[in-house]
């Protein structure tokens, strides 16, 4: 975990549909930081969308790209980074995030994920089979990783995105990870 607000990096982790990008973008505004969605960055660099990368390179190829992008993003000062839901499955990503920034886990129920992810279009891991079963399986596998990595755990199930972002900002300030800034 970083202790310098001059070098603040916030990594948003959590399952798909937890609000990492939406809350992260708002949080970046509150903290006067840049915002980057790692999946969008991967797509921009690759010139293809995530489902195509999964189809052509498989999850292993995608995770390799993800690790490279996260490694570069972790060198930027004052940035909020929304990671993909599976970024935590790779040991090197977990180590990178814990050593270079503050890790915020947005906790959300599978029921909320189902509502927020809609048909699952554009989400390769939901493309086949029963969506609820897949989400429950992913949660079972990843929840211990999210919990173990997180510096802050914030419920994103009921609140609106701005309220969740404000709660994160207040928790960061309470833990002396940044000054409390009025917006």
Residue ranges of predicted features:
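NTP-dependent small-molecule kinase module
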Residues: 1-5, 26, 30, 76, ...
